[in-house]
């Protein structure tokens, strides 16, 4: 049931997006104003080293829980039945999507080309695909498409009656923020805009810091 690495090199992804799209909106009602910028990227791929190590060596990410409880239940049943590991067919665990390699057999029956139905220990799977040397990178290559609320601003123009004695022409105040909401992302646990470097390391991510979220206030006075 364990995956086999294809020895023939092939392209697994491309970090260049198909296109980017931004939507800017401005609203006003009486003395209130609201402006926002929604930005999206369609297409592009990213290899996430953070997800590779978080699921693999440490098993800290929730994605690595898939099949874990079922594997423990299968092992409890095996031990209760007094059956050796090599003689036991697991009833649960991690199931890799794919087909059996040519020449594969189970219990003496040829299963070449058939859909994989053999459960394996999730730890063994993630340990196999997260080794830096001779690892299988493909499970940690993600579609980097995303939608973000990039900017949001709310303002209020103070009525003249409140500052008339101050001899001001206008007075407005408000709050603003950037990178407030990752609305949609196909990349778990990390920001899809993360990168390893700003050079030719684009499309790779490893232990990247989250994109900074900024929140502030503004005060505009005309005299």
Segments and roles (model prediction):
Residues 1-223:
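Outer/extracellular conduits and scaffolds centered on Gram-negative outer-membrane beta-barrels
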